[in-house]
Amino acid sequence: MALEKSLVLLPLLVLILLVLGWVQPSLGKESRAKKFQRQHMDSDSSPSSNSTYCNQMMRRRNMTQGRCKPVNTFVHEPLVDVQNVCFQEKVTCKNGQGNCYKSNSSMHITDCRLTNGSRYPNCAYRTSPKERHIIVACEGNPYVPVHFDASVEDST
């Protein structure tokens, strides 16, 4: 009788441990979609020629911790509009992958580039407001942006 219970409980215990081992590392870990939003979305503001915009935003969004992120782009459009890019013109990503999409229309963005000579922990950025098409990599269910690949000028 005790052996029968052990034979039933052992696989159940193994299954529970496997599930916990699989779920635990993802607890508290930022998803790729959330990371994209943190690093690239700034729907609440319009592009700013304020020279301190990038310095403030890069710090605020935790992109200057441990190192200075060399380049970053903020998109100043509603999140739903950026998510809809995942269903627009399919293009090849810079890395050769086939999950990138180009926006049908220009979007308001701000490019942030590390200035020459800037070193961690004193990360200093050049702020460049622009209006360009964006290219994002999408994945998941729901299918959403997970990587900002590039911005391109209107070809018309």
From Swiss-Prot:
Cellular component, GO annotation: extracellular region
Which cysteines does the record link by disulfide bonds?
C54-C112, C68-C123, C86-C138, C93-C100
UniProt record, GO biological process: defense response to Gram-positive bacterium
Q: Which UniProt keywords apply?
A: Disulfide bond, Endonuclease, Glycoprotein, Hydrolase, Lyase, Nuclease, Secreted, Signal
UniProt feature, compositional bias: Basic and acidic residues: 33-43
**At which positions is substrate bound?**
K35, R38, K69, P70, V71, N72, T73, K94, R113
Q: Where is this region: Disordered?
A: 33-52
State the family it belongs to.
Belongs to the pancreatic ribonuclease family.
Q: Which protein are we looking at?
A: Ribonuclease pancreatic
Which lineage ranks, top first, belong to the organism behind this chain? Answer: Eukaryota, Metazoa, Chordata, Craniata, Vertebrata
